[in-house]
């Protein structure tokens, strides 16, 4: 059993001042670490901090969160009641700045600083963090490093035959800033993703014609369902049941998920077969979904045209699609094809390709980072945490950021140090995980190679953080919670899945928040009020 030790004097560099970086800074400093954030932007917020710099991924001024304020937030800092159910980019920015100010984090953030490389120093005792501050190169040494610079940093863009001869403009959604740049143009979007749902409605208002090219169908969810935010359909109990099914009955879970999603999609009304939205859509368990209800409206109104996947460029301004259709007057092609994490500043991270016994089961994806629990490089688990490679691992936006930061702090302080096995054990676990990734890739080759097993990933981090959620389980602790406080037991199991629950139970591993109980009750009351208001509106109609 590992022993707890004081981290006083240990320096930590945190890369990135988005929600995860801010949570990490607050937690580490509260636990005694001398932590500092290095952020390339001029303010906190990560991608929620709008920037004109086209090399950075940013939420646009019209971007609206996909997750409601009721389930998205920090564990000890509630969102103000006056915010709407779904926050805008500026409101998220405002909230994150208020969080930073409230907890006195600003004094420990170095802005306008880009980290260019992280490597071990000459005597292998510390990390050398190379950075550029105000255009000047600087190198500083730290005991530990946490990478929170996001998994949406590098734009992914396909290449097509004849692309170099295209006489129009080809760009990625990452570069999009001003919709007026496309006034009077014919524009093709490649990919039907969350970024497309942000950009397409803006371009439609200015362009002459807009086409959306997609090779296959996609699952489209609206933010609202029966008058309530869609994310409120999931509560703690349903999530745990889902994890159980995914873990023990993955094929059945995938089939049931597809059936349920198809049912929900059809609730949006008639879907024109020519849109191909339900045609060969990738399994939900292997790909993330998008809130794209606005896209459905644009399709119905004829303001955008659904096209098959791009096959090639034919010279001039011609684009050929996989069904043989050719459009010969396209001014701009915008790739909405996603992002990948940037490992270029972390040259020490090892990558490998899963071995396959059978050729027909061969993994053909890119080499996968070798990280235990998709966080810790085995040789440096005691001093390096990489939080840019855990796709599907988080629930409810950045509400999980506090769980991750508490877990890492506890592991490094020795409070949960026994949860990190030996290097050989970590290597074996990584090999097994990569085989799981390979199996997913064979079924769906667009799946993210940084995916995690949610049930395994979250169980590990909750235990390391000491959130005490085992008190909501089906064991004796769960029954004891119900007997002592049936109201809270019911609200946390079947009510709104709030972040405050992560600081409700006393476990001795992390600080509880005295306001957690009231915040959980208040959030559920707000949702109950919202439901009543929506019901009243429906009756009036």
Predicted regions and their residues:
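N-terminal glycine-rich dinucleotide-binding loop that anchors FAD/FMN and/or NAD(P) in oxidoreductases
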Residues: 52-80, 232-240
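Glycine/threonine-rich phosphate-binding loop and adjacent beta-strand/alpha-helix elements that clamp
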Residues: 67, 336-413
């Amino acid at each position: 059993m590992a022993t707890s030790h004081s981290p006083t004097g240990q320096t930590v560099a945190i890369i990135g001042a988005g929600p995860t970086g801010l949570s990490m800074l607050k937690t580490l400093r509260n636990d005694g670490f001398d932590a500092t954030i290095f952020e390339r932007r001029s303010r906190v917020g990560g991608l929620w901090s709008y920037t004109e710099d086209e090399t950075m991924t940013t939420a646009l001024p019209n971007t609206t969160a996909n997750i409601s304020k009721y389930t998205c937030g920090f564990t000890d800092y509630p969102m103000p009641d006056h915010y709407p159910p779904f926050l805008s980019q500026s409101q998220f920015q405002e909230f994150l700045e208020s969080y930073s100010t409230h907890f006195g984090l600003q004094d420990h953030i170095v802005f306008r600083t880009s980290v260019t490389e992280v490597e071990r120093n000459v005597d292998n005792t510390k990390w050398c963090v190379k950075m550029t501050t105000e255009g000047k190169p600087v190198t500083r040494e730290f005991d530990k490093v946490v990478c929170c610079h996001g998994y949406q940093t590098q734009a992914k863009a396909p290449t097509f035959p004849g692309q170099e001869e295209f006489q129009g403009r080809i760009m990625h959604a990452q570069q999009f800033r001003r919709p007026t740049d496309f006034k009077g143009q014919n524009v093709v979007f490649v990919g039907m993703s969350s970024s497309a749902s942000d950009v397409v409605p803006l371009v439609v208002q200015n362009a002459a014609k807009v086409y959306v090219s997609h090779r296959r169908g996609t699952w489209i969810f609206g933010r609202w369902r029966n008058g309530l935010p869609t994310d409120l359909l999931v509560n703690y109990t349903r999530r745990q049941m889902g994890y159980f099914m995914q873990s023990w009955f993955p094929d059945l879970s995938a089939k049931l998920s597809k059936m349920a999603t198809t049912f929900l999609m059809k609730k949006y009304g008639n879907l024109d077969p020519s849109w191909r939205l339900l045609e060969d859509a990738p399994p939900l368990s292997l790909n993330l979904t998008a809130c794209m209800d606005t896209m459905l409206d644009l399709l119905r109104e004829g303001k955008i045209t659904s096209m098959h996947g791009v096959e090639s460029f034919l010279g001039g301004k011609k684009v050929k699609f996989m069904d043989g259709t050719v459009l010969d007057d396209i001014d701009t092609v915008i790739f909405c094809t996603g992002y990948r994490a940037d490992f270029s500043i972390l040259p020490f991270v090892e990558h490998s390709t899963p071995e396959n016994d059978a050729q027909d089961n061969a993994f053909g994806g890119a080499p996968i980072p070798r990280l235990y629990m998709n966080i810790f490089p085995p040789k440096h688990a005691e001093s390096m945490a990489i939080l840019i490679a855990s796709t599907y691992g988080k629930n409810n936006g950045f509400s999980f950021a506090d769980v991750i930061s508490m877990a890492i702090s506890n592991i490094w302080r020795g409070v949960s140090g026994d949860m990190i096995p030996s290097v050989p054990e970590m290597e074996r676990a990584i090999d097994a995980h990569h085989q799981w990734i390979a199996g997913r890739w064979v079924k769906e080759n667009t799946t993210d190679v940084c995916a995690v097993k949610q049930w395994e990933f979250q169980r590990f981090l909750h235990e390391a953080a000491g959130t005490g959620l085992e008190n909501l389980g089906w064991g004796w602790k769960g029954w004891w919670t119900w007997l002592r406080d049936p109201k809270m037991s019911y609200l946390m199991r079947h009510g709104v899945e709030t972040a405050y629950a992560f600081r409700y139970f006393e476990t001795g591993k992390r600080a509880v928040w005295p306001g957690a109980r009231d915040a959980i009750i208040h959030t559920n009351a707000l949702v109950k009020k919202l439901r009543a208001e929506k019901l009243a509106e429906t009756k009036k109609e």
